[in-house]
Amino acid sequence: MHIKVLEIDVSKTYPLRHALLRKGKALESCFFPNDTSEKTIHLGAFESEQLIGILSAYPKDCPDHNHLEGVQFRAIAVAPSHQRKGVASNLIQHAIKIVEEKLHPDFIWLNARIEANSLYQTNGFKSIGAPFEIESIGTHQRFLKPLNNDT
């Protein structure tokens, strides 16, 4: 399987966001604050010409580390037919490089669904704090990946 990761327009993320992360909810539930900010980065993983995975990165301080510059990863999703084949890790690794080059944050953080914890641990993220509930979505764990020695 040959995967190509490219920057994409936010509108291309909505079908996978809706189907995998907001199933049964209105399409508008997939529109996030700052989706269209010029500093927000949206990535797509493609096999041939088919979009099979997405990841969005937003310059945003982490509630636990608001004294440093952070970038939040959100809406990481992979088509069911391609899950557990390294697509999400590929997206995460590409996103880390692009974010470091373009935005120069001190760290990257995210709120992960509990069932995805091992994905983020495998990619160098450390859990912080206790698990918490996001209403109508489920139990999440916050993760952080330092990008410099001060974090």
Model-identified regions with their sequence ranges:
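Conserved acetyl-CoA-binding loop-helix of GNAT-fold acetyltransferases
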Residues: V78, R84-K97
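Conserved catalytic-core motifs of GNAT/GCN5-like acyltransferases
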Residues: W109-N111, Q121, K126-R142
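Conserved GNAT acetyl-CoA-binding A-motif
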Residues: I92, V99-A112
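Short amphipathic alpha-helix that is part of the acyltransferase structural core
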Residues: M1-F32, T36-I52
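Conserved beta-strand in the GNAT
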Residues: G44, Q50-D61, Q72-A77
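Residue-level recognition of the GNAT/N-acetyltransferase active site
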Residues: R74, A79-P80, N111-R113
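A conserved beta-turn-beta hairpin within the catalytic core of GNAT-like acetyltransferases
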Residues: K60-F73, Q83, K102-D106, I137
